[in-house]
Amino acid sequence: MSLFDRPATASVLYDVPGPKARARYRLFGILSLLGVAGLLWYVIATLADNGQFDADLWDPFQYNAVQQMIVDGLLSTLKAFGLAAALSLTLGALLATGQLSDHRPVRWTCTAVVQFFRAMPLLILIVALYYAFFAKDPMWALVLGLTLYNGSVQAEIIRSGVNAVARGQGEAAYALGMRKSQVMSSILVPQAVRSMLPSMIGQLVVTLKDTSLGYIITYNELLFMGKKIASQPLNAAGFPYIPVVLVIGPIYIALCLLLTALARWIEARGRRGANRRTSAAA
Amino acid sequence: MRTSRTLAVALCAVALTATAACGKDGSPGGSAASSASNAPALPTYTVKTDVKVDSPVIAEAKKRGQLIIGAKADQPFLGWEDVASGDRSGFDIEIAKMIAADLGFTPQQIKWQTLVSSQREPAIAKGQIDFYVGTYSINDERKKTVSFAGPYYIAGQDLLVKNDNTSITGPESVSGKNVCTATGSTSIKNIQQYNPKITQFDTYSACVEKLLSGEVDAVTTDDAILKGYASKYAGKLKVVGKPFTKENYGVGLNKDDKTLRDAISDALKAHEDNGDWKKAYDATLGLSGSAAPAVPTLERY
Amino acid sequence: MGFLFEQDNFALFRDGFLQTIELSALSALLALLLGTLLAAFRVSPVPILRAFGTTWVTLFRNTPLTLLFFAVTFGLPPLGVHFSHLVFAVLALGGYTASFVCEVIRSGINTVPLGQAEAARSLGMSFGQTLTLVVLPQATRTVLAPMSSVFIALPRNSAIAGAFSVPELYSAQQTFSERGYSIFAIFFWVACAYLLISATIATLFRFLETRLAVAR
């Protein structure tokens, strides 16, 4: 029962609970635990009644060919993600440079591009690219779509990161006689990177998740394979949509959590290097 | 950063291949179109050598040593792919193999590409596939973007309902009912005039799942497709049996490639005349219980 | 470009546009309510509620939206939950966006000066009162900017519903390309529609920002 007894001290929103409050929290805790457990039990029981856990429905997953499909799908997902990540970071850096340019036409063009692709649904962008240019090679429609959209978002992240560096830093550098490119590359960007990294990696998580849209344009990624397994059942027990979601979902979640863990690790390292005061958590 | 991601990827791959090491090969007996022991055998086709078809698509295919054929993968007895073995089977698949043989390609030289209904036109027009065989109804609107060889089969739109459903007896009785069909199919337009509530997914299998779970009252499309599902889920689903349209199935190919169209028409004609068509029908669609219809007359243009 | 005014194309486009707006508005409402509730869970003194909030956010933020749509569309009916496909889409999109809203609000709560909550508590306010009367109203201001990106992303994400039997703009696009119109012309009109929606939301948030900034 340690979960209920642990005193809640970490927050400024409430006092350290006294004996009465602790009893009340424990009651709340037990009630909500019962509620959640009840709901979970209902879901599992109904699904079981429905035959969703019958061996027949899970049958596909024991075949080599099906397991190979999932591995291939995973690799295709990672391949598209790798390409899109590299390209979108490059495009983001270019667009951000453009947006921070002193030349008005360059600045306006880049801002327009960024705003346009940030507003377009990725799905529509990918499908349009597929129909118009890449019907032979759906992977590039997916990668290019992801690049255009995520590159625009990365550009915004970089731009606001650079703008968030204290103004005096840039002014001091100019006063020392540095040129704009020097100010950017040796003063502003190095300082901005530290604060930008978490959001940039957060956006990479979004990129990873969005590779799943490839299924709509016949790119053989993980979700495409999952859908294939679900819609071509081996026996007459029904379509294994729920088993497929239960298998594919955790794979995506694990991949995203790995990326997020990476983000957190980098953030922690950055904080250590900067000698920053640790802020009080609420 | 680089190393830890590579490590993560490697770990995932290892975890998956490790589980993969204890899997089964092959596919379970009695899957959709593989059949009982006394079932009619599939015909085999003699692969022609020395084929001269002056078509850019075929020239390209010869060069790559592979013919890329688009097909459906989730329609029992028509276009089916067994996920456990990777084998394709069904009437459309047989038709595609016949044509491939006459164009000089062995079944091993065929690369199948699964495409759902709404993806067919762009894939053909842009050359993602060489041609498409998969319950593709010939109509004038589609002839604007692709061309057709055939028809090689005539189907009619019908309704698939649950076995105990007595209220849906034909298209007139679907008004206000929830009817499911596939995006990008001709079936939508045909059923719309009867005022049902329409649900759309990209595949018919999603519709059948929705019918089995009671979300929709009926699935509508060509009877050939529906019969396959009805016999796969015998005892749960039935076909109403009142076709209300005529759908001419054709082989879809590049709009301007008349040479290829003629070659495919010749191939169809030859196999219809030598009895392969009938044998293929008996070994696939015939298993769903309906006798072979008359061979349709080819329309050449 | 002129194809939009042929046949019944304009009606189809208009219906798709309205459906996109309806879907986005309903999902936004669900996301806002659920997201605030989850944020309250995540800062609450009851450990189980905190764990529930954290689990929800972890699950929904890290699952592709398309997979969530699959889970809702094909997973709920076997549980005896039968709704129209619009409601399914609202559940998937709303539940997904709620996890983002929750994180934005939570980080907003963290920016409210410590003294505010301490003062509220020393006046004898309970956790609920501290949160709803003192902390959240102040957090609203700081969360507006990140919140606007979440809600601009929402109509964009709603396009996925088109593949799950909701007749919105994406499915109108599909129908148009089946009718054989040029993909560039179709893309032009659909792009205009989405730009209009996102510009409207951006303007709305900018208006809110100026309104609330005065109060500070």
At which residue positions do the language-model features occur?
Chain B
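Bilobed "Venus flytrap"/periplasmic-binding protein-like clamshell domains
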Residues: 88-103, 136-137, 155-208, 223-227
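Short helix-initiation/N-cap motifs at beta->coil->alpha
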Residues: 110-122, 166-167, 183, 199-213, ...
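A ligand-binding cleft/hinge motif common to bilobed small-molecule-binding domains
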Residues: 119, 135-144, 212, 217-246
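Extracytoplasmic small-molecule ligand-binding "clamshell" domains
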Residues: 32-42, 47-132
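Extended ligand-binding regions for polar small-molecule ligands
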Residues: 23, 38-52, 185, 251-289
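Periplasmic-binding protein-like
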Residues: 154-161, 223, 227-268, 288-301
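Acidic, polar ligand-binding/catalytic clefts
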Residues: 108-173
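Bacterial lipoprotein signal-peptidase II cleavage site
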Residues: 19-33
